[in-house]
Regions:
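A phosphate-binding catalytic loop at a beta-strand-loop-alpha-helix junction
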Residues: 88-98
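Cys-dependent protein tyrosine phosphatase-like superfamily
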Residues: 1-88, 102-138
Length: 138
């Protein structure tokens, strides 16, 4: 798990066994940014969703296939980060989660600040700077 902000964290794939610990850490929402069946052995989001309900966590399924970033996904992520609930987002490596967060965050903050936060979380999205500038300008 990598901290992006005090209220937004990203991670690689989780399992149902991880959910109780995530709940103990004070998260209120888990977001799945990964479609089912990307690889053998991946825990289906429905199992994660059920376990979230059993642990009083809100679950949101926002699957993003690699290379299929949409304005709808960005808008939904924007809504999430504006709620300011402690949110745990996961995908295969965390890269899709941090990408969606960055695209949403530039609507609120400067691109350079956003990329700095991304880098501090251990990711490199500098190649998306022009794209993020376009989102910021729109």
């Amino acid at each position: 798990m990598k901290k992006v902000t005090d209220s937004f964290f990203v991670s690689s794939q989780i399992t149902v066994e991880d959910i109780p610990e995530i709940a103990k850490q004070g998260f209120s929402t888990i977001v799945c940014n990964r479609p089912n069946h990307e690889e053998i052995g991946q825990t289906d989001y429905q199992k994660i969703e059920l376990c979230c309900a059993q642990n009083n966590l809100k679950f949101i399924n926002l699957p993003m296939s690699p290379g299929h970033l949409t304005s709808d996904l960005i808008d939904q992520t924007y809504d999430l980060i504006n709620e300011e609930n402690k949110t745990f987002a996961y995908c295969r490596t965390g890269t899709r989660c941090i990408t969606l967060w960055a695209c949403a965050n530039v609507k609120l903050n400067e691109v350079s600040e956003t990329l700095d936060q991304v880098n501090q979380a251990g990711y490199d999205l500098d190649h998306l700077q022009d794209f993020l500038e376009d989102i910021k300008a729109s």
